[in-house]
Structures are given as structure tokens and as C-alpha cells.
Amino acid sequence: MSRRSVTKKRVVPPDAVYNNRLLSMTIRRVMKSGKKSLAARIVYDALDIIKERTGSDPIEVFETAIRNLTPLVEVKARRVGGATYQVPMEVRQGRGTALALRWLIGYARQRSGKSMAIKLANELMDAANETGGAIKKREDTHRMAEANKAFAHYRY
């Protein structure tokens, strides 16, 4: 373990169009090979598709989706006397958001469809309605934590 001082958290600047930090984080996650303008176009197109289909505020749908995807508990491997236990741990807010974004974009990429904007929009709308692959991943994570509740006393 490092003996250096704790690193300072970087402040994520909000995005240019909606002035939203969470959206800026999403754009950075969608980005591949440093192509940020393309990633931004994909995310904004996805929000336009959501607005077109639902008729409601796309930022509200987006934030609801992220809130629904954020896990409360996860399991971490802990080695105790030759055996490895899956120990349930509470998820900190920053990590929970990061996991939610990772799952959202991962399952959007796996979807079959024409463009990434359409796939991302569909995954966001599904997550807001508590369906879809990313929600299933969150439920699996919670189920794993529940199944391994007996090892909660190994928390560190």
C-alpha cells in the first residue's frame, strides 16, 4: 500500500449543452480513442431520441436511469485462511455512479441495432423503466451480496 498522501479527487466539469456533470461523465465513458466530439454527438443524439419518443425531459429520464442502475451493495473477494470469501460491501456514491455508467454503456454496446445513439437511448429508457440488461446486472449484484450475507463480518 502506498504511503503517499491521498490523491485529490478531480472535479468533473459539466457538459456544454445541458450543464450536467453526470452527462459529462457519460460522454467520457462513451468516448473511444480520444474522439470526444463523436462521443458527445452520440450522447446528445440519444437524448434527442429519448425526447422524441417519450415527450418528457431527457435529462430526467437519464438521471432516473442512473439512479435505478446505481448498486447499493457489491461483493469483494477476501482471502481468509486459504479460502476466498465473497464479502458483501456497501458501495460508495462515486463508485456506484461509475458502476452504473459502466454497465449502462457496456450493455448498450452489446445491443443489436443500427447506431450507438439508438442503442444508448433504448438502454436508458429501459433502465428508467427498470428493465434491460444493465438493470439485470444490478439485480445480480444485489442477489450475490444477499447470498453471501453470512460473510459480512469479514468486512475490512
UniProtKB/Swiss-Prot annotation:
Alphabetical list of HAMAP family matching this protein: Ribosomal_uS7_B (MF_00480_B)
In terms of PANTHER family, this protein maps to:
RIBOSOMAL PROTEIN S7
**Is Iron-sulfur one of the keywords UniProt gives this record?**
no
Q: How does it assemble?
A: Part of the 30S ribosomal subunit. Contacts proteins S9 and S11.
One GO cellular component term of this record is: small ribosomal subunit
- Family from the record: Belongs to the universal ribosomal protein uS7 family.
Taxonomically, which superkingdom? Bacteria
Protein keywords: Ribonucleoprotein, Ribosomal protein, RNA-binding, rRNA-binding, tRNA-binding
Q: Where are the transmembrane segments?
A: none
Q: What does this protein do?
A: One of the primary rRNA binding proteins, it binds directly to 16S rRNA where it nucleates assembly of the head domain of the 30S subunit. Is located at the subunit interface close to the decoding center, probably blocks exit of the E-site tRNA.
- Name this polypeptide is given: Small ribosomal subunit protein uS7
Q: Which one Pfam family would you cite for this protein?
A: Ribosomal_S7
Q: Which SUPFAM superfamilies match?
A: Ribosomal protein S7
Query: Which CDD domains does its entry note?
Result: uS7_Chloroplast (cd14871)
